[in-house]
Amino acid sequence: MAEGEEPEKKRRRIEELNEKMVVDGGSGDRSEWQGRWDHVRKFLERTGPFTHPDFEASTESLQFLLDTCKILVIGAGGLGCELLKDLALSGFRHIHVVDMDTIDVSNLNRQFLFRPKDVGRPKAEVAADFVNDRVPGCSVVPHFKKIQDLDETFYRQFHIVVCGLDSVIARRWMNGMLLSLLIYEDGVLDPSSIIPLIDGGTEGFKGNARVILPGMTACIDCTLELYPPQINFPMCTIASMPRLPEHCVEYVRMLLWPKEKPFGDGVVLDGDDPKHIQWVYQKSLERAAEFNITGVTYRLTQGVVKRIIPAVASTNAVIAAACATEVFKIATSAYVPLNNYLVFNDVDGLYTYTFEAERKENCSACSQVPQDMQFTPSAKLQEVLDYLTENASLQMKSPAITTTLDGKNKTLYLQTVASIEERTRPNLSKTLKELGLVDGQELAVADVTTPQTVLFKLKFIS
């Protein structure tokens, strides 16, 4: 409305808009108005040169989007805000969003669903409220929790899952969850059990979008080598010769936290807990002052602890649009979906490239067969642990290793529970033979990167 309009004129204009509304199904819900979905109908109620060969234009596809299709968005940050907006305006009206984070003032420059008054509130709840208020008829249901806190029944209800995450671990866990929902009959995959995963990621002016059909195409773990490893600083530098503010934060995170246990025994440092970050920040300042290092800030501390990646709003918009387009293609079957990996880069000019990521036959996540591990009988369990964490195809974080000996389950090593870690630590220095393991022995490995236990088959070599 033009600025300075008289109240009476404003009122008349609002009444005119209301008169154009069409009651949807006689329910009294004025969430539909004449021509609201014309932009979507142009794609679904006529054919064109790019439509899927088997697509038949009809009104049913739009009704499926509006009334039936359920979409799960993981993450309500930079990508997530864009995704929620794009999906809601594309006709998807049944959306759930999961995010465990709260709004920080640094989010406001690019996460446009949030306002200064929202700082400190859960991202999922604020984003859902904003979209529900702004897009009539759309129902966004928020879940302020970790993805690991939701069970199989929850995930099974959705037609498509779309991720806007900044964590490789969370991506892998979500990938593993959708793989665990697959149903096989006599070794043949039941297509109706497949829940497509659309994954987007950004880093500065670079981004990617991919389409994953669990059990059919390359999964996250099949292409794990594509994700850059986290930057780690040498321990000797952190402990004795710090030169950067990041060194001070890493010193507190890696050495002081487990030593001083400021919040009790067994409490893991949580990058989303303000009390934890404040403690690390204060200790980092003390460490920096000791070595005359400047530049330690609260924001830097949180960035180092959470491994925060720089974000650019325009990149988020492009990748979210690509992901939302793929969701639309798959939900309606109107167009052939991406096959299956899109790369975007606008550092120098504009560059995009699409290629087909290939599925790994021996992928530890989706291959359905135990992966071979080759060691000598004299190799120590520590070497197996190093293999699980350092191998580019596995990149596990805190693997727990169990096996079956004499018909009983035996935990060889588990580091996430302090009492069990202390009891099983001596096993790390023992050889595989001393532990009673034999050629062909199956090892079950659990890790934070997957909701499933991963099976490995031990193969002794000379």
Curated annotation (Swiss-Prot):
Alphabetical GO CC annotations of the entry are: cytoplasm; nucleus
Q: Name one GO biological process term.
A: protein neddylation
**Region listing for Interaction with ube2m core domain, in residue ranges:** 367-462
Residues that hold ATP according to the record: 99-123, 147-170
Reactions accelerated catalytically: ATP + [NEDD8 protein] + [E1 NEDD8-activating enzyme]-L-cysteine = AMP + diphosphate + [E1 NEDD8-activating enzyme]-S-[NEDD8 protein]-yl-L-cysteine
Q: Identify which top EC class this enzyme belongs to.
A: ligase
Gene3D superfamilies, alphabetized: NAD(P)-binding Rossmann-like Domain (3.40.50.720), Ubiquitin activating enzymes (Uba3). Chain: B, domain 2 (1.10.10.520), Ubiquitin-like 2 activating enzyme e1b. Chain: B, domain 3 (3.10.290.20)
Q: Where is this region: Interaction with nae1?
A: 241-247, 291-294
**InterPro entries (alphabetical):** E2-binding (IPR014929), ThiF/MoeB/HesA (IPR045886), ThiF_NAD_FAD-bd (IPR000594), Ub_act_enz_dom_a_sf (IPR023318), Uba3_N (IPR030468), Ubiquitin-activating_enz (IPR035985), UBQ-activ_enz_E1_Cys_AS (IPR033127)
Q: Which residues form the active site?
A: C236 (glycyl thioester intermediate)
Question: Which pathway does it serve?
Answer: Protein modification; protein neddylation
Provide the assembly information: Heterodimer of uba3 and nae1. Interacts with nedd8, ube2f and ube2m.
Name of the protein described by the UniProt record = NEDD8-activating enzyme E1 catalytic subunit
The encoding gene: uba3
